[in-house]
């Protein structure tokens, strides 16, 4: 699985510039990290699912970005980071591919990943018809305990909206948790970063453990008709946000191999659900 490594490699570049001229690796007001995470999930899912590759090759499945879904039951709406979908007949944006999206978001691939991407069928962007899978990615980078209620609510509202719109759709969640003991927050370092940086101190690994435990409380489902995510992954990173390389953490509190929240488990589960739920598509 390449997604987590692609994510930390890409986040190691400080190319999110704020209005004060500061360049950041992560900025809470940018959706860059979410799009990179979702790109990696789709990349790994394409590699893992023969049926999805066939559907893409046949031109049956496309992707959409920031797609608005509306919960029919409660009449609430939410923009989802990335969806896999059939194409609508309505006019929309010109088609763009997953490869082009990687260039647009500055996603950093190594030679092996580039070679594997080149072998995959071209997944194109299209106006969204029926949503097959909706991906939502969130991050908990600092002030962990204070951020948890909002993080939980944002992730919880995603699967509710997806399944309120169409119960057959696969709802996938991704959460990135920072385990760095100190952090340079863009919110606290606007004009003073170069001369007098203000560091946020974390009690680690306790703060990261609190976040991971809270995310584990999100509802999950094993069949349509139930409430919850169809698949959910937690990735732990070490990001100081000062320009130093971002690290991928594999030791606890990061989910271990075989854990249902491990990234590879999520990809395997998504591939299995897709194969059973959409075997007759097209």
Residue ranges and their predicted role:
Residues 136, 170-177:
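Short, conserved beta-strand edge motifs with alternating hydrophobic and charged residues
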């Amino acid at each position: 699985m390449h997604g987590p490594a692609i994510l930390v490699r890409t986040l190691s570049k400080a190319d999110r510039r704020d209005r004060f001229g500061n360049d950041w690796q992560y900025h809470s007001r940018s959706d860059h990290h979410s799009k990179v995470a979702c790109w990696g999930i789709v990349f790994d899912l394409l590699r893992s699912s023969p049926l999805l590759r066939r559907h893409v090759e046949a031109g049956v499945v496309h992707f959409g970005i920031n797609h608005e879904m509306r919960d029919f039951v409660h009449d609430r709406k939410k923009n989802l980071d990335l969806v896999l979908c059939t194409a609508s007949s309505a006019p929309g944006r010109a088609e763009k591919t997953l490869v082009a999206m990687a260039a647009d978001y500055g996603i950093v691939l190594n030679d092996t990943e580039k070679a594997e991407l080149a072998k995959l069928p071209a997944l194109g962007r299209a106006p969204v018809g029926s949503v097959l899978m909706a991906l939502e990615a969130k991050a908990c980078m600092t002030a962990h305990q204070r951020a948890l209620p909002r993080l939980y609510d944002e992730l919880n509202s995603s699967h509710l909206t997806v399944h309120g719109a169409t119960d057959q759709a696969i709802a996938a969640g991704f959460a990135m948790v920072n385990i760095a003991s100190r952090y340079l927050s863009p919110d606290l370092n606007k004009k003073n970063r170069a001369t007098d940086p203000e560091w946020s101190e974390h009690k680690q690994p306790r703060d990261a453990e609190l976040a991971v435990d809270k995310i584990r409380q999100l509802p999950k489902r094993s069949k349509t008709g139930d409430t919850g995510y169809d698949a959910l992954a937690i990735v732990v990173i070490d990001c100081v946000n000062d320009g130093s390389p971002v690290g991928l953490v594999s030791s606890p509190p990061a989910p271990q191999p075989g854990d249902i929240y491990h990234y590879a488990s999520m990809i395997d589960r998504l591939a299995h659900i897709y194969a059973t739920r959409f075997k007759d598509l097209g």
